[in-house]
Amino acid sequence: MDQVRAKKALGQHFLTDLNIARKICASLSGGTFEAPAAVLEVGCGMGVLTQFLLQRCDVVVYGAEIDAESVEYLHGHYPDFAPRLIEGDFLKMDLRGRFGSGVRVIGNFPYNISSQIFFKIIENRDLVPECVGMVQREVAVRIAEPPGSREYGILSVLLQAWYDIEYLFTVGEKVFNPPPKVKSAVVRLRRNGVRSLDCDEQLFVKVVKASFGQRRKMLRNSLRAVFGDFGAEHRFFPMRAEQLSVADFVELTQWVADNMPDGDIPRG
């Protein structure tokens, strides 16, 4: 019982359905037999997904696992994999130092840090061409939704700026131990062709966050709360944040940059 509580505290719900594990594994593209792609599994647990990844000849599998009990289990059951298993926190990992030539990411992501995992992927978008992750269903819906949806939000915009996102399939509660209280879903992110935005990218993040900070209000009011009064109007001001596409937010960011006095643009 204490071990189960510990897993819950880590946000971990271990997948027990082998067919779903195979399906998740097959959803990730790889390299070739001659040039296998590096793949990092985040949260290997007891190796339910790991075992199928290790069967592929087009990938070299690495793992990130923070739970000492799981690490010990994996060392005992997959000794050939053990040298590539990193005991530690994925969120603190130096991906560039370890995978300078790029790495695909996959995993049954702990619910309590799934959004943080996606933010880390955004930060390392030049290194991560693809990600397949199982997350809480509401998170999967949120990041895959187009503009105009109530679920569309900050993470939706920031991920869709750099990745094409597919909601692959829903996963029920009974295939986990311990069973979560919500449904899960698997999503796939594939790097799009955007290499840079036509605006200040740090300011873009600030504008997106400010816009959704009071998402029920018109953008005029949401932005004013962070940037102050511009003394001018933009055509998006009567709209709400959820109505704007990534391209719209790029346009709005450039307008904010052009209409703020030099040195007054918040960067934090």
Model-derived features: positions:
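A short, ordered amphipathic alpha-helix with a cationic face
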Residues: 192-195, 223, 227
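Catalytic cores of RNA-modifying enzymes
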Residues: 1-210, 247-255, 262-268
